[in-house]
Amino acid sequence: MTNHDFIVTTQWSVGRDEVGLAKGDVINESISIPSSLGGVGEGTNPDEMLVAAASSCYIISLAATLERAHFNDISINQESVGTASLTNGKFKMEQIKHQPKISVEASQKEALEKRLDKLLKIADNNCMISNSIRGNVDIKIEPYIL
């Protein structure tokens, strides 16, 4: 087994109406409670970062899966929506829905349509974030081929 450490430091002062900082090798972002939840809404927030992590992991995994399946001249634009709920005073991410729009050469469109379901599952199974949240967060994939 090989382990990889991803180190992020966070800073916060005072109460809930403040702005903190999340910093890693590349990320250097202000963090706060979203304004939609009564916070100051500056920078990003853990909910958005969770959806961004799931989305970026899935799109990278999907691109690699399509490449290994010999679909080389593609582009993917994806929207991902995280749906959270408040139940008994506790917030929980219920679902993350990925909607990849895959552009492929016309000559490969039919072949991709035939193999797409299997390739989507392979990509999801190879995504570390999907593997980490599966069982706690429902992951939906609604693809479009352009």
Model-derived regions: residue spans:
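Extended beta-strand/beta-hairpin segments
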Residues: 1-52, 60-146
